[in-house]
Amino acid sequence: MTVSLEGLYRGESLTSEQTEQLFGELLRGEMDPIVLSSLLTAMKVKGESPSEIEGAARALIAAAKPFPRPDYEFCDIVGTGGDGLYTINISSTAAIVGATCGIKVAKHGNRSVSSKTGSSDLLEKLGIKLDMSPETARHCLDEANICFLFAPHYHSGMRFAAPVRQALKTRTIFNVLGPLINPARPTYQLMGVYSPDLLEPIAETLHALGLKKGMVAYGSGLDEIAVHGETQVAEINDGHIRYYTLTPTDFGLKYYPLESIQGGTPDENRKITETLLAGKGTDAQQAAIAINLAPLLKMGGLVDTLKQGAEMAIETLRSGDALDKVTQLATLSHKE
């Protein structure tokens, strides 16, 4: 191993370069599992720094299967997971509605780790081929405004960390890396985090990784923008990071109790999503999708305000057109 961990054991942070080197070794299968275990634990106890998160993310992006990146603007909407609140699939549903509105979304996701249904679990239930090739995914993004990048398909080196992660049974740096390592490298992004302590380090990391426009959100216990309370936000805009609070009122929406957006099993969540996309969801469910899609519609230039974004999202949901978008994506995803 080329980088000494002595400083880390003393509570000092690694540099971005040191972390990138270490994670490069891990992804090539060159790191002893005991060393990896102590690396992850020492980082967790100290608290992962922005430089460490950035270095690890750079190593994962560099080692990922390449994606034919387009030259147009496109986004991702994703959460860290780990909030333990088992809501409906907000980000996946919002991605589909966003594509129907006219923004382009390259959704990077995985199977569920801590919730009942991850984005992959849901999209698979909707008939979308998870392991489509990068070229097919790019074609979907071009033609349908949306594609799905299944994390294990692009980040095969992560398999070397899996046994240690399972044995540790605790959150580590990997829990926050997933949303940062989309191999398509979106130009703008909404990312939800499971703790307010992550707002600043994640915003700084996204900025360091070159994201021009983005929002990191923690919504009263949720890794989404909340319909049931306040949302703390870190907004990235051309090199500046601004911290503030949002409420449903800022979107022209009412407050709804958290129980009104509860999810369930993969089958139950698929039914809820299909009902929503067909224009028949509850007001609370529609509000949860709209409040999380509105910032992306604004960043993507389709609207000028968050209220206009929420209105566009709800109008699109109620039209039922988003269900056709799922059919289009499912069909294109199977064409190799």
Swiss-Prot record:
Anthranilate 1 binds at G79, N110. Keywords: Amino-acid biosynthesis, Aromatic amino acid biosynthesis, Glycosyltransferase, Magnesium, Metal-binding, Transferase, Tryptophan biosynthesis. Catalyzes the transfer of the phosphoribosyl group of 5-phosphorylribose-1-pyrophosphate (PRPP) to anthranilate to yield N-(5'-phosphoribosyl)-anthranilate (PRA). Homodimer. GO terms for biological process: L-tryptophan biosynthetic process. It comes from Tolumonas auensis (strain DSM 9187 / NBRC 110442 / TA 4). 5-phospho-alpha-D-ribose 1-diphosphate binds at residues 79, 82-83, 87, 89-92, 107-115, 119. NCBIfam families: trpD (TIGR01245). Mg(2+) 1 binds at S91, E224. Gene3D superfamilies: Nucleoside phosphorylase/phosphoribosyltransferase catalytic domain, Transferase, Pyrimidine Nucleoside Phosphorylase, Chain C. GO terms for molecular function: anthranilate phosphoribosyltransferase activity; magnesium ion binding. The keyword Transferase applies. Pathway: Amino-acid biosynthesis; L-tryptophan biosynthesis; L-tryptophan from chorismate: step 2/5. Belongs to the anthranilate phosphoribosyltransferase family. Anthranilate 2 binds at R165. One of its GO terms (cellular component) is cytosol. Binds 2 magnesium ions per monomer. Mg(2+) 2 binds at D223, E224. Its cofactor is Mg(2+). This is Anthranilate phosphoribosyltransferase.
